[in-house]
Swiss-Prot record:
Main location (coarse class): membrane
Gene name per UniProt: atpC
Record CDD domains: F1-ATPase_delta (cd12152)
Superkingdom: Bacteria
Quaternary structure and interacting proteins, as annotated: F-type ATPases have 2 components, CF(1) - the catalytic core - and CF(0) - the membrane proton channel. CF(1) has five subunits: alpha(3), beta(3), gamma(1), delta(1), epsilon(1). CF(0) has three main subunits: a, b and c.
Role description: Produces ATP from ADP in the presence of a proton gradient across the membrane.
Protein name: ATP synthase epsilon chain
Protein localization: Cell inner membrane
Keywords: ATP synthesis, Cell inner membrane, Cell membrane, CF(1), Hydrogen ion transport, Ion transport, Membrane, Transport
Species per Swiss-Prot/TrEMBL record: Rhizobium etli (strain ATCC 51251 / DSM 11541 / JCM 21823 / NBRC 15573 / CFN 42)
């Protein structure tokens, strides 16, 4: 049986989750990471994607995050998201709205680095839209 550790998922709007868990899968910018108790101390940036949380009771919960960073310690993990919602609360039309807003910003972007980041963000949101279920 896996050891438990404290996990918090925080966005500017609210604290989405604070509980003991056995496993958290985060969409780190360098690749998907599975965090468990006694993980080596790590800080990583988070890209838009799905965070999967397995609670101490065995229940699995998924959340959509739109970037941020995670602070991982042997005793816990805190994920500070730019924006986050439970996956069942997010609809494809919201993702489409975010994609269109990023495309409009891309039209007016002048710096190559800014354009490149926006193009990558649009690609990540488009992929995310493909995995979020429509009600």
């Amino acid at each position: 049986m896996a050891d438990n550790f404290n996990f918090e998922l925080v966005s500017p709007e609210r604290l989405l989750l604070s509980e003991m868990v056995t496993e958290v899968v985060v969409p780190a910018t360098e690749g998907e990471m599975t965090v468990m108790a006694n993980h080596a101390p790590t800080m990583t940036t988070i890209k838009p994607g799905v965070v999967s949380v397995r609670s101490a009771s065995g229940k699995k919960q998924d959340y959509v995050v739109f970037g941020g960073f995670a602070d991982i310690l042997p005793t816990g993990c805190t994920l500070l998201a730019e924006s986050a919602v439970p996956v069942e609360e997010l609809h494809k039309d919201e993702l489409t709205r975010r994609i269109e807003a990023a495309r409009k910003e891309l039209e007016h972007a002048e710096l190559h680095e800014h354009k490149s980041r926006l193009e990558h963000f649009i690609m990540e949101l488009t992929h995310l839209r493909g995995i979020v279920q429509q009600d």
